[in-house]
Amino acid sequence: MTAVSTTATTVLQATQSDVLQEIQSNFLLNSSIWVNIALAGVVILLFVAMGRDLESPRAKLIWVATMLVPLVSISSYAGLASGLTVGFLQMPPGHALAGQEVLSPWGRYLTWTFSTPMILLALGLLADTDIASLFTAITMDIGMCVTGLAAALITSSHLLRWVFYGISCAFFVAVLYVLLVQWPADAEAAGTSEIFGTLKILTVVLWLGYPILWALGSEGVALLSVGVTSWGYSGLDILAKYVFAFLLLRWVAANEGTVSGSGMGIGSGGAAPADD
Protein backbone atom coordinates (compact mmCIF):
# COMPACT_ATOMS: atom_id res chain seq x y z
CA MET A 1 0.00 0.00 0.00
CA THR A 2 2.86 2.34 0.86
CA ALA A 3 4.59 1.63 -2.46
CA VAL A 4 1.45 2.43 -4.40
CA SER A 5 0.94 5.68 -2.51
CA THR A 6 4.55 6.69 -3.07
CA THR A 7 4.28 6.02 -6.81
CA ALA A 8 1.07 8.01 -7.10
CA THR A 9 2.62 10.90 -5.19
CA THR A 10 5.65 10.89 -7.47
CA VAL A 11 3.46 11.12 -10.55
CA LEU A 12 1.46 13.99 -9.11
CA GLN A 13 4.63 15.88 -8.13
CA ALA A 14 6.08 15.99 -11.65
CA THR A 15 6.82 19.65 -12.34
CA GLN A 16 6.07 21.67 -15.45
CA SER A 17 9.80 21.67 -16.13
CA ASP A 18 9.80 17.87 -16.12
CA VAL A 19 6.84 17.82 -18.48
CA LEU A 20 8.38 20.45 -20.76
CA GLN A 21 11.61 18.47 -20.96
CA GLU A 22 9.66 15.35 -21.92
CA ILE A 23 7.74 17.24 -24.62
CA GLN A 24 10.90 18.74 -26.10
CA SER A 25 12.66 15.37 -26.13
CA ASN A 26 9.82 13.85 -28.18
CA PHE A 27 10.27 15.22 -31.71
CA LEU A 28 6.91 14.02 -33.02
CA LEU A 29 4.99 15.44 -30.08
CA ASN A 30 6.86 18.74 -30.00
CA SER A 31 6.66 19.33 -33.74
CA SER A 32 2.94 18.51 -33.86
CA ILE A 33 2.31 21.29 -31.33
CA TRP A 34 4.51 23.98 -32.87
CA VAL A 35 3.33 23.40 -36.43
CA ASN A 36 -0.22 23.99 -35.22
CA ILE A 37 0.78 27.17 -33.38
CA ALA A 38 2.49 28.54 -36.50
CA LEU A 39 -0.46 27.71 -38.74
CA ALA A 40 -2.94 29.20 -36.27
CA GLY A 41 -0.99 32.47 -36.29
CA VAL A 42 -1.03 32.65 -40.09
CA VAL A 43 -4.72 31.74 -40.22
CA ILE A 44 -5.65 34.47 -37.73
CA LEU A 45 -4.01 37.13 -39.89
CA LEU A 46 -5.62 35.69 -43.02
CA PHE A 47 -9.10 35.65 -41.49
CA VAL A 48 -8.77 39.24 -40.28
CA ALA A 49 -8.09 40.28 -43.87
CA MET A 50 -10.86 38.11 -45.31
CA GLY A 51 -13.55 39.44 -42.99
CA ARG A 52 -12.67 43.12 -42.85
CA ASP A 53 -15.27 44.19 -45.45
CA LEU A 54 -18.25 42.18 -44.18
CA GLU A 55 -21.26 44.34 -43.35
CA SER A 56 -24.35 42.23 -42.62
CA PRO A 57 -24.88 41.20 -38.97
CA ARG A 58 -25.22 37.49 -39.79
CA ALA A 59 -22.06 37.46 -41.91
CA LYS A 60 -20.19 39.25 -39.13
CA LEU A 61 -21.39 36.72 -36.56
CA ILE A 62 -20.15 33.88 -38.76
CA TRP A 63 -16.83 35.68 -39.10
CA VAL A 64 -16.47 36.15 -35.33
CA ALA A 65 -17.27 32.48 -34.70
CA THR A 66 -14.79 31.52 -37.40
CA MET A 67 -12.08 33.79 -35.97
CA LEU A 68 -12.47 32.29 -32.52
CA VAL A 69 -11.47 28.85 -33.82
CA PRO A 70 -7.78 29.68 -34.51
CA LEU A 71 -7.68 32.12 -31.58
CA VAL A 72 -8.70 29.37 -29.16
CA SER A 73 -6.37 26.90 -30.86
CA ILE A 74 -3.25 29.07 -30.67
CA SER A 75 -3.93 29.76 -26.98
CA SER A 76 -4.50 26.12 -26.16
CA TYR A 77 -1.55 24.83 -28.16
CA ALA A 78 0.67 27.39 -26.43
CA GLY A 79 -0.46 25.82 -23.17
CA LEU A 80 0.58 22.42 -24.50
CA ALA A 81 3.95 23.74 -25.70
CA SER A 82 4.71 25.20 -22.27
CA GLY A 83 3.73 22.04 -20.40
CA LEU A 84 0.95 23.90 -18.58
CA THR A 85 -1.82 21.59 -19.83
CA VAL A 86 0.20 18.38 -20.08
CA GLY A 87 0.82 15.87 -17.30
CA PHE A 88 1.93 12.37 -16.43
CA LEU A 89 -0.75 9.79 -15.63
CA GLN A 90 -0.29 6.30 -14.23
CA MET A 91 -2.51 3.94 -16.22
CA PRO A 92 -4.83 1.68 -14.19
CA PRO A 93 -4.76 -2.14 -14.09
CA GLY A 94 -6.23 -3.62 -17.26
CA HIS A 95 -4.80 -0.92 -19.51
CA ALA A 96 -2.16 -1.92 -22.07
CA LEU A 97 0.30 0.37 -20.27
CA ALA A 98 -0.87 -0.50 -16.74
CA GLY A 99 1.40 0.88 -14.04
CA GLN A 100 3.38 3.04 -16.45
CA GLU A 101 3.57 6.82 -16.44
CA VAL A 102 2.08 8.11 -19.68
CA LEU A 103 2.36 11.68 -20.91
CA SER A 104 -1.15 13.08 -21.32
CA PRO A 105 -1.65 16.28 -23.40
CA TRP A 106 -5.05 16.78 -21.77
CA GLY A 107 -5.09 20.45 -22.82
CA ARG A 108 -6.35 19.36 -26.23
CA TYR A 109 -9.74 18.85 -24.63
CA LEU A 110 -9.76 22.53 -23.68
CA THR A 111 -9.14 23.35 -27.33
CA TRP A 112 -12.04 21.21 -28.43
CA THR A 113 -14.39 22.36 -25.66
CA PHE A 114 -14.06 26.01 -26.70
CA SER A 115 -13.38 25.75 -30.45
CA THR A 116 -15.79 23.06 -31.66
CA PRO A 117 -18.86 24.95 -30.34
CA MET A 118 -17.69 27.88 -32.50
CA ILE A 119 -17.60 25.59 -35.52
CA LEU A 120 -21.15 24.48 -34.80
CA LEU A 121 -22.23 28.08 -34.18
CA ALA A 122 -20.84 29.09 -37.57
CA LEU A 123 -22.57 26.15 -39.27
CA GLY A 124 -25.84 26.89 -37.50
CA LEU A 125 -25.67 30.54 -38.55
CA LEU A 126 -24.90 29.46 -42.11
CA ALA A 127 -27.95 27.18 -42.11
CA ASP A 128 -30.03 29.91 -40.41
CA THR A 129 -31.32 27.34 -37.96
CA ASP A 130 -33.48 27.96 -34.90
CA ILE A 131 -32.00 28.68 -31.49
CA ALA A 132 -33.27 25.46 -29.89
CA SER A 133 -31.50 23.32 -32.46
CA LEU A 134 -28.34 25.41 -32.17
CA PHE A 135 -28.42 25.17 -28.37
CA THR A 136 -28.85 21.40 -28.60
CA ALA A 137 -25.88 20.96 -30.92
CA ILE A 138 -23.56 23.16 -28.86
CA THR A 139 -24.46 21.69 -25.47
CA MET A 140 -24.19 18.13 -26.76
CA ASP A 141 -20.80 19.03 -28.21
CA ILE A 142 -19.58 20.44 -24.89
CA GLY A 143 -20.82 17.31 -23.15
CA MET A 144 -18.88 15.22 -25.66
CA CYS A 145 -15.65 17.10 -24.96
CA VAL A 146 -15.98 17.15 -21.16
CA THR A 147 -16.76 13.43 -20.88
CA GLY A 148 -13.92 12.74 -23.31
CA LEU A 149 -11.61 14.60 -20.93
CA ALA A 150 -12.91 12.50 -18.05
CA ALA A 151 -12.19 9.33 -20.02
CA ALA A 152 -8.64 10.50 -20.64
CA LEU A 153 -7.90 11.52 -17.02
CA ILE A 154 -9.42 8.63 -15.06
CA THR A 155 -6.66 6.52 -13.50
CA SER A 156 -8.70 4.63 -10.91
CA SER A 157 -10.47 2.22 -13.26
CA HIS A 158 -9.79 0.99 -16.78
CA LEU A 159 -13.48 0.14 -17.18
CA LEU A 160 -14.60 3.65 -16.21
CA ARG A 161 -12.30 5.15 -18.82
CA TRP A 162 -14.24 3.25 -21.48
CA VAL A 163 -17.58 4.04 -19.82
CA PHE A 164 -16.90 7.75 -20.16
CA TYR A 165 -15.61 7.16 -23.69
CA GLY A 166 -18.98 5.57 -24.50
CA ILE A 167 -20.86 8.49 -22.94
CA SER A 168 -18.78 10.92 -24.99
CA CYS A 169 -19.60 8.98 -28.16
CA ALA A 170 -23.31 9.13 -27.26
CA PHE A 171 -23.10 12.93 -27.09
CA PHE A 172 -21.34 12.82 -30.45
CA VAL A 173 -24.22 10.86 -31.98
CA ALA A 174 -26.59 13.65 -30.91
CA VAL A 175 -24.35 16.21 -32.63
CA LEU A 176 -24.27 14.07 -35.78
CA TYR A 177 -28.06 13.85 -35.78
CA VAL A 178 -28.38 17.63 -35.77
CA LEU A 179 -25.77 18.04 -38.51
CA LEU A 180 -27.06 15.29 -40.78
CA VAL A 181 -30.81 15.36 -40.17
CA GLN A 182 -32.00 18.73 -38.87
CA TRP A 183 -29.76 21.42 -40.33
CA PRO A 184 -29.69 20.39 -44.02
CA ALA A 185 -33.37 21.37 -44.38
CA ASP A 186 -32.68 24.74 -42.73
CA ALA A 187 -29.76 25.34 -45.07
CA GLU A 188 -31.94 24.51 -48.06
CA ALA A 189 -34.48 27.11 -46.98
CA ALA A 190 -31.72 29.66 -46.38
CA GLY A 191 -30.18 29.14 -49.82
CA THR A 192 -26.88 27.91 -48.40
CA SER A 193 -27.34 24.18 -48.92
CA GLU A 194 -24.43 23.70 -51.33
CA ILE A 195 -21.68 25.10 -49.11
CA PHE A 196 -23.39 23.70 -46.01
CA GLY A 197 -23.38 20.23 -47.54
CA THR A 198 -19.66 20.45 -48.26
CA LEU A 199 -18.79 21.68 -44.78
CA LYS A 200 -21.16 19.19 -43.15
CA ILE A 201 -19.44 16.22 -44.81
CA LEU A 202 -16.00 17.64 -44.06
CA THR A 203 -16.92 18.10 -40.40
CA VAL A 204 -18.55 14.71 -39.92
CA VAL A 205 -15.78 12.73 -41.62
CA LEU A 206 -12.97 14.51 -39.78
CA TRP A 207 -14.68 14.53 -36.39
CA LEU A 208 -15.14 10.77 -36.63
CA GLY A 209 -11.35 10.53 -36.62
CA TYR A 210 -11.04 11.86 -33.07
CA PRO A 211 -12.71 8.97 -31.18
CA ILE A 212 -10.87 6.52 -33.43
CA LEU A 213 -7.52 8.09 -32.51
CA TRP A 214 -8.50 8.09 -28.84
CA ALA A 215 -9.25 4.38 -28.98
CA LEU A 216 -6.03 3.51 -30.82
CA GLY A 217 -3.73 5.87 -28.90
CA SER A 218 -2.18 5.65 -25.44
CA GLU A 219 -5.47 6.70 -23.85
CA GLY A 220 -7.18 3.63 -25.34
CA VAL A 221 -5.52 0.38 -26.42
CA ALA A 222 -2.09 2.02 -26.89
CA LEU A 223 -1.41 0.83 -30.43
CA LEU A 224 -0.12 4.31 -31.31
CA SER A 225 2.58 6.25 -29.47
CA VAL A 226 1.94 9.61 -27.84
CA GLY A 227 3.82 11.40 -30.63
CA VAL A 228 1.99 9.65 -33.46
CA THR A 229 -1.35 10.23 -31.75
CA SER A 230 -0.50 13.90 -31.27
CA TRP A 231 0.28 14.31 -34.96
CA GLY A 232 -2.99 12.59 -35.77
CA TYR A 233 -4.91 15.05 -33.60
CA SER A 234 -2.96 18.01 -34.99
CA GLY A 235 -3.64 16.92 -38.56
CA LEU A 236 -7.34 16.60 -37.82
CA ASP A 237 -7.34 20.00 -36.11
CA ILE A 238 -5.71 21.62 -39.13
CA LEU A 239 -8.30 20.19 -41.52
CA ALA A 240 -11.38 20.32 -39.28
CA LYS A 241 -10.68 23.83 -37.99
CA TYR A 242 -8.44 25.90 -40.25
CA VAL A 243 -9.39 24.44 -43.63
CA PHE A 244 -13.06 24.31 -42.61
CA ALA A 245 -13.01 27.91 -41.40
CA PHE A 246 -11.20 29.12 -44.52
CA LEU A 247 -13.73 27.49 -46.85
CA LEU A 248 -16.63 28.91 -44.85
CA LEU A 249 -15.27 32.43 -44.57
CA ARG A 250 -14.27 32.54 -48.25
CA TRP A 251 -17.80 31.55 -49.26
CA VAL A 252 -19.44 34.04 -46.89
CA ALA A 253 -17.22 36.88 -48.15
CA ALA A 254 -18.13 36.04 -51.77
CA ASN A 255 -21.84 35.47 -51.09
CA GLU A 256 -22.70 37.99 -48.40
CA GLY A 257 -25.90 38.88 -50.23
CA THR A 258 -27.17 35.31 -49.81
CA VAL A 259 -26.19 35.25 -46.16
CA SER A 260 -27.80 38.59 -45.33
CA GLY A 261 -30.80 37.94 -47.59
CA SER A 262 -32.11 35.03 -45.52
CA GLY A 263 -32.14 37.17 -42.41
CA MET A 264 -31.33 36.32 -38.84
CA GLY A 265 -33.21 33.06 -38.50
CA ILE A 266 -31.78 32.21 -35.10
CA GLY A 267 -34.79 31.67 -32.94
CA SER A 268 -37.20 31.28 -35.81
CA GLY A 269 -35.60 28.69 -38.08
CA GLY A 270 -35.70 31.22 -40.89
CA ALA A 271 -39.48 31.40 -40.80
CA ALA A 272 -41.22 34.54 -42.01
CA PRO A 273 -42.77 36.74 -39.31
CA ALA A 274 -46.47 36.34 -38.67
CA ASP A 275 -48.95 38.92 -39.96
CA ASP A 276 -50.17 41.50 -37.48
UniProtKB/Swiss-Prot annotation:
SUPFAM superfamilies: Family A G protein-coupled receptor-like (SSF81321). GO terms for molecular function: monoatomic ion channel activity; photoreceptor activity. The keyword Oxidoreductase does not apply. Residues 1-21 form a propeptide. It is a multi-pass membrane protein. It holds the Pfam family Bac_rhodopsin. Residues 52-57, 128-130, 181-192, 255-276 are cytoplasmic. Keywords: Cell membrane, Chromophore, Ion transport, Membrane, Photoreceptor protein, Receptor, Retinal protein, Sensory transduction, Transmembrane, Transmembrane helix, Transport. InterPro entries: Arc/bac/fun_rhodopsins, Rhodopsin_retinal_BS. GO terms for biological process: phototransduction. Residues 22-25, 82-105, 155-157, 217-225 are extracellular. The chain crosses the membrane at residues 26-51, 58-81, 106-127, 131-154, 158-180, 193-216, 226-254. Gene3D superfamilies: Rhodopsin 7-helix transmembrane proteins. The modification N6-(retinylidene)lysine is found at K241. This is Halorhodopsin. Light-driven anion pump.
